[in-house]
Every structure is written in C-alpha cells, then in structure tokens.
Regions:
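Short alpha-helical "patches" and their helix-cap loops
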Residues: 1, 99-108, 166-177
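Cysteine-cluster motifs in flexible loop/terminal segments that predominantly coordinate metals
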Residues: 140-184
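Surface-exposed loop/turn and secondary-structure junction residues enriched for glycine/proline
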Residues: 33, 40, 85, 102, ...
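Short, structured coil/loop segments at alpha-helix boundaries
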Residues: 1, 77, 86, 118, ...
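Generic detector of well-ordered alpha-helical segments enriched in charged/polar residues
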Residues: 4-7, 122, 126-129, 133, ...
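Metal-dependent nuclease catalytic cores that hydrolyze phosphodiester bonds in DNA/RNA
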Residues: 1-66, 178-184
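Nucleic-acid nuclease catalytic cores
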Residues: 38-39, 45-138, 151, 157
Length: 184
C-alpha cells in the first residue's frame, strides 16, 4: 500500500509540471524494438538544454532525464539499475537521442542516486532481454526467488515467486493448473 501511495503522483500521466527550465512528465509509456521491451516510466524530467531534443509545442531543446521511484533503499544487486538502463534505452529509441544518466529515488532513505548509463550496463540489459526472449521462445517459466520484500512488489501476482522456485515448461504448468481445477 505504501508503494502505491508513493507512486500515485508519479503514475498519473495527467499531472505535468513546468518549473523554470524543467518540464516533468509522469507515467510515460515507452518501448524498444531493439530490446523487445515496453514499460511505463515513473518520471521524465526534460531540462532546457541545447544538447537536448525538440519537443512538440515547446521552444528550444530539452534534455530528458529519467527518475525511477523505489519504495525501499538501494539494493545490493543491480536490479534497479538494470530497470533504469532498460527504460533509458527505450526512451532513447523513441526520442532519437543519447541519454548519459538517470536517477533512482529511494523513498525510505530519501536518496536520489545518479546512475551513469555505461556501455557495460547497456550490454547487460541487452543480454538479459535476449535471455528473456529465449525463455519465452522455449515456453519456459524462469525460476524466481521469494524474498520478504516480494509482497511489496507490484509484480508479485505476475512473478509468483512462491510457485516458481525452478524453471518450468509452460505447457506442464498449465496442465497442472487445469488438473488441480478438475479435482475441485
């Protein structure tokens, strides 16, 4: 619930702000044909800058910066960074520009962390996207680990970490699900 409250403003695409030379856009839909991914960005800040891109209905050029909101604190692994980099690649593809950095904002510790979008991170995201598509093509459900934070995640009902502790075949999964319904 707390994460939902945190995202209420960030997830509302109708709330747009302009303060001085910064336009803030929320809940922007993005996709990448290159990665085969799509998603919704929490916040994109467009800063007036000659190195930026033109925006329809706005004078000058605007440099986009993504701000991804997280309820908790920085993780010991790269999952938040990978998400931000994937979002960046999607936005770059749509706008036809290069984005050098983005931000992760961690609510519980009130920390806005600048993340450089490096070529190594871009390669990692491309590799992970490729692996994801391979799982899909092979009709496999990847294993997921259950952590106490899983219940706070907006994707817990899709990921189902308690049920997917090992890689499984989709056809077998559906068969087992239907089989258990037949016994009711």
């Amino acid at each position: 619930a707390h994460g939902q409250i945190l995202h209420q403003k960030a997830d509302n695409p109708y709330i747009k702000e302009k303060r001085k030379d910064v336009i803030t856009s929320r809940a922007m839909h993005v996709s990448s044909k290159e990665l085969g991914l799509y998603g919704i960005l929490d916040v994109v800040e467009f800063h007036k800058d000659e190195k930026g891109v033109p925006l329809k209905g706005k004078r000058g050029k605007w440099l986009p910066t993504i701000v991804e909101y997280k309820r908790g604190k920085p993780k010991s692994d790269t999952r938040d960074i990978v998400q931000l980099v994937a979002q960046t690649i999607c936005l770059e593809e749509i706008l036809g520009c290069a984005i050098e950095y983005g931000y992760l904002y961690y609510y519980s510790v009130n920390q806005k962390k600048r993340i450089e979008i490096t070529s190594d991170l871009r390669k990692e995201v491309a590799n992970l996207a490729c692996q994801m598509h391979e799982y899909y093509d092979k009709k496999l459900i990847p294993k997921a680990e259950y952590f106490k934070n899983c219940q706070l995640c907006s994707l817990v009902d899709i990921c189902m970490p308690r049920l997917s502790k090992k890689t499984r075949n989709v056809d077998n999964y559906i068969f087992q699900a239907l089989k258990s319904e037949d016994s009711l």
